[in-house]
């Protein structure tokens, strides 16, 4: 009996900049389709937003504050029925810096 996990590769991508994230997704989709595998996604996952509030001055002016935020964009993809060529091509793929990749087989 075959399991579902061997019939697909689940890829989760994270980045601070959505533009480089979309470029990385496009490279993975092109690579998977060129090797004959199907692609489901990319599915945009909710963006994590971390907000930080700090005082502008060190000693006085409590009312004067500055706010910063950090956004983490995420995408989820499934590569359906991957071949050995697909796995090799994904292993050799160089993605832009700043993109975190999680692969589950």
From Swiss-Prot:
GO terms for cellular component: ribonucleoprotein complex; ribosome. SUPFAM superfamilies: Ribosomal protein S10 (SSF54999). Pfam families: Ribosomal_S10. PROSITE patterns: RIBOSOMAL_S10. PANTHER family: 30S RIBOSOMAL PROTEIN S10 FAMILY MEMBER. Part of the 30S ribosomal subunit. Involved in the binding of tRNA to the ribosomes. This is Small ribosomal subunit protein uS10. It comes from Desulfovibrio desulfuricans (strain ATCC 27774 / DSM 6949 / MB). The gene is rpsJ.
